[in-house]
Amino acid sequence: KDYGHLLKDDARYAARAERVSSLARDVSELLPDLVPALRGRLNKPAGPVAYHPPCTLQHGQKLRGGVEAHLAELGIELRLPQEAHLCCGSAGAYSVLNPGIAGTLRERKLGHLQEKSPVDGTRPARIVSANIGCITHLQAGTETPVTHWIELVDELLQK
């Protein structure tokens, strides 16, 4: 999405980059159009689902709240953790270059993601996110399955 901005002064690529930027979409931006077609076609998940909104989505692309709202519209009991706005420690190459700090951030994030519900005392059966770096980083610290939210939707879709 940033190619247009990054290459705006490049005489050869500025127009092409702007075109690519205008076409680029995160898969979550398709959800508003898909919810009506998916409503009523999903099985219920095995249990509550915790959602980790990745930095790439909420800070990089400034896309906040959409995934959560639309998954809830589809009947998925979604839990947002405390400190949802904070990084899980993956941060691209950060987890490789600074594994100690990245591990500390991961443990803090997983602690919040896996908290028991104050209502019924259950823990999430699954964690979903929207960034492969976050997904692999979080999965390395827990036995709870961690996947992309679209994988969850695909699995729940009555085929």
Predicted regions and their residues:
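Iron-sulfur cluster-binding electron-transfer modules in prokaryotic oxidoreductases
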Residues: 1-159
